[in-house]
From Swiss-Prot:
Protein's cellular compartments: Cell membrane
Topology within the bilayer: Multi-pass membrane protein
GO biological process, one term: potassium ion transport
Highest classification ranks of the organism: Bacteria, Bacillati, Actinomycetota, Actinomycetes, Mycobacteriales
Name this protein carries in UniProt: Uncharacterized transporter DIP0570
Keyword ATP-binding: no
TM region(s), chain numbering: 27-49, 54-71, 83-105, 115-137, 142-162, 177-199, 383-405, 409-428, 441-463, 478-500
One GO term describing the cellular component: plasma membrane
A Pfam match: Asp-Al_Ex
Primary subcellular site in the record, as a coarse category: membrane
Length: 561
């Protein structure tokens, strides 16, 4: 006796079981009907595998992509709604833009514009390489154009080609997706292989490179200095006079009487100050402005303490605008993330910054209230600015940009949010709106956005990858895309290191920025433990994102012309 299962299992038969036992349902079919459970499972398994080290290398969040790809290859019905990866990518790139905004525009004025021009040239070169591969191997033109987008991880570029083809021949509008799906996994694997193998062969010292670039500071110390003859100016001008990143915090009048070093106080011969900086900076500064002086600080009425910045009245403002001396304290050290740095007057305070302050003991409670120092306030994150910023970014993403021939393109859900994030991150605040978020909240949102993006895009690529297992022609598309990916990463290393004097990690960050692939930058950050790769990534990401949308459509037009 057999029981037929209705509706979606119609036509399939199962052996009769006892009435008290439920009819078994295939686990993959069950997951296909439960996308939320599927998403959670992919995230859990992927993040678990990402912690495992293979030959000293761990994939981190990138493992989520491969778990999603594996599941959807076994059963193409395992698809997550497009909204999942669209929202994930938008959250990730917007958070990246917020954190990198100030540095991006500051860097652009120095060498950022050079890297922007390099990225434009690189995309043109890769477009030519892809064109040659398609013609040499006789690949289908439309699938080949999709291969180019997949090899450089350009989901917006692929979407732009689909939209363009819908206006030309709707019957082939889905073919770029096939090429994209086949090439996309190789884009992740290829870039990670170049970064990992290159770092091993070149014996890259990640921490030393980051320190040389000023991204990892030596521990800060303090010492006393007696100002020598011929040193004229104010305390605020002392770093300039010394030519070093130092800060004066105390004027020493006697063993028991110290006062705060006000910026407008005049320097004079014999004046004794307490200054802070790295050991090397202190040594060089003292040699220029005077001589070292032993200063006991235990028996004075000035004390020091660390507070966390959480006050809305302080966040987003420059230290110089706070007039801290009038409020009874001086900020001697600024800790953001894992690094202590000497604060500068133009530094803008962010949520969750840790500051070391010096103040009279009887005013320390007042200083605490001024800065906030409330973990509860930081945990109560105001998501309104983040949501409003996403709205601005997504709105920018849908604005049509006209092209010759009557075609249009848009920045999409990946390009628009990063443009908005960079601008708003550089602004810090607009009136009462604080665009920046607490450090931990920003990292959590960006990591979660990255993970759900990888889960969503991984399941969408499974159909094409499954075809490759049975169609030899698909293997040619995979190989062609892999060549484009490897070529772009190698060009970044071979050009950026000698021409722009970039370290290996930053050059690989530029390569990751070329692919605009969050999985690659996640891997690089996990392996290096520094911000070098992120700096390179953020510098070229906007140009690469926009450039690939244009390049993908230009390649398609060149192939079908």
């Amino acid at each position: 006796m057999q029981i037929r299962v209705p509706q979606r299992n119609r036509g399939r038969t199962f052996p009769h079981r006892s009435s008290h036992r439920r009819t078994p349902i295939h686990i993959l079919e069950f997951l296909a009907a439960q996308p939320l459970l599927t998403l959670a499972l992919i995230l859990a398994v992927g993040l678990l595998i990402g912690k495992i080290r293979f030959f000293g290398i761990s994939l981190g969040a990138a493992a989520v992509l491969f778990v999603a790809l594996a599941l959807s290859t076994v059963d193409p019905a395992l698809q997550l709604p497009p909204l999942v990866y669209q929202l994930g990518l938008a959250m990730f790139v917007y958070a990246i833009g917020l954190s990198a905004g100030s540095e991006f525009f500051a860097e652009f004025r120095h060498r950022g514009w050079k890297l922007t021009l390099f990225m434009i040239g690189l995309l043109m070169l890769m477009m030519a390489v892809a064109y040659g591969i398609i013609k040499l191997f006789g690949l289908d033109e439309i699938i080949g154009a999709g291969m180019f987008a997949g090899a450089l991880s350009s989901t917006p570029g692929m979407a732009a080609m689909v939209e363009m083809l819908e206006g030309i021949d709707d019957s082939v509008a889905s073919e770029p997706v096939v090429g994209y799906s086949l090439a996309y996994p190789g884009a992740v694997i290829g870039s990670i292989l170049v970064a990992a193998i290159g770092a091993k062969l070149m014996k890259v010292n990640h921490a030393a490179d980051a320190a040389e670039e000023g991204l990892v500071s030596d521990p800060l110390e303090w010492t006393g200095v007696r100002i020598g003859p011929g040193i004229n100016g104010t305390i605020a001008q002392l770093p300039t006079l010394a030519g070093e990143e130092i800060i004066a915090t105390r004027v020493v009048h006697s063993k028991t009487f110290h006062s705060l070093a006000a910026p407008n106080d005049r320097l004079h011969e014999g004046m004794v100050l307490v200054i802070h900086g790295t050991p090397d900076a202190l040594e060089r500064a003292i040699a220029k402005v005077g001589k070292q002086q032993d200063v006991p600080i235990e028996d004075t009425d000035l004390v020091y303490s660390r507070f966390t910045v959480s006050s809305k009245a302080v966040v987003g403002r420059k230290i110089s605008d706070l007039d801290t001396v009038r409020s009874g304290f001086i900020i001697s050290r600024l800790r953001r993330g894992d690094a202590d740095v000497v604060p500068e007057p133009d530094d803008v305070l962010h949520y969750s910054d840790r500051v070391r302050v010096i103040a009279p003991a009887n005013r320390m409670s007042e200083v605490r209230r001024f800065l906030g120092d409330s973990e509860r306030s930081l945990a109560d994150v105001d998501l309104m600015p983040f949501a409003f910023g996403l709205v601005i970014g997504l709105a920018i993403g849908v604005i049509p940009i006209p092209l010759p021939g009557g075609n249009t393109l848009s920045l999409g859900f990946g390009g628009g949010p990063i443009v908005a994030g960079l601008i708003l991150g550089a602004l810090n605040r607009t009136g009462p709106i604080h665009w920046q978020m607490p450090y931990h909240a920003s990292r959590t949102i960006s990591t979660f956005g990255l993970a759900i993006f990888l889960a969503g895009v991984g399941t969408s690529a499974g159909v094409g990858f499954r075809q490759a297992l049975t169609d030899p022609a698909s293997l040619t598309v995979i190989a062609g895309g892999f060549i484009v990916t490897i070529s772009s990463a190698l060009v970044c290393a071979l050009v950026c290191m000698p021409l722009f004097k970039l370290k290996w990690d930053e050059a690989m960050g530029v390569a990751a920025g070329c692919t605009t692939n969050p999985a690659i930058i996640s891997y690089l950050n996990g392996q290096t433990g520094t911000e070098l790769a992120t700096r390179g990534y953020a510098t070229v990401y906007p140009t690469a994102m926009i450039g690939k949308i244009i390049a993908s459509q230009m390649l398609l037009l060149a192939l079908i012309a």
